[in-house]
Amino acid sequence: MPRSEEGQLTIEKTPSYFITKDVPRRVYQFSKHLKLIVVVRDPVTRAISDYTQVASKKMDSRSFEEMVFVDNTSRIVDTQWSPVRIGVYAKHLKHWLQYFPLEQMHFVSGERLIENPADEMLKVQQFLGLRPVINHRHFYLKSRKGFPCILKPNRQKGSHPHCLGETKGRIHPMIDPSVIRRLRDFYKPFNIKFYRMVNQDFGWV
């Protein structure tokens, strides 16, 4: 990590930290006073998005329906498949709570971050103890993909847009509705447990 100057907050972003079992202990050893920001989204949508990313690189030619179950007949969800395993947020959070209190964590709804980024960023700024400077004027909707873009101020040229890369917002494949229902049933108890752990309802159930 880069050094933080006085009066400066440094953010390090590595998505895999949240789901890697040994990381909470190592992070705690680095600093037990830091704050943690976790962006979560509907685990069913997240799994499909993860699959879409892999499929776009042609790393596996099998369909989502073939990958998500242990076999084609049992309808038992394959919890060892990474796109499924990552979405069991309660399991991952349990490891972090062994080292950090909930007060040092802030959970951002991935859905609300897209729908209303200014409100979500206000909560983040408040959590970090910052004077709010990012507001609705810093965002606009990129209609083609439905993702908000950021207007970054430039002293010489004025505000200029910064949008997410082309890898974001890929069109998801059509998934058998019965598979979606099976996944929602699978995640439901884990989602409810996660809601209780963080005292927040994300609306996935």
What are these regions (language model features)?
Residues M1-V205:
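Anion-recognition interface
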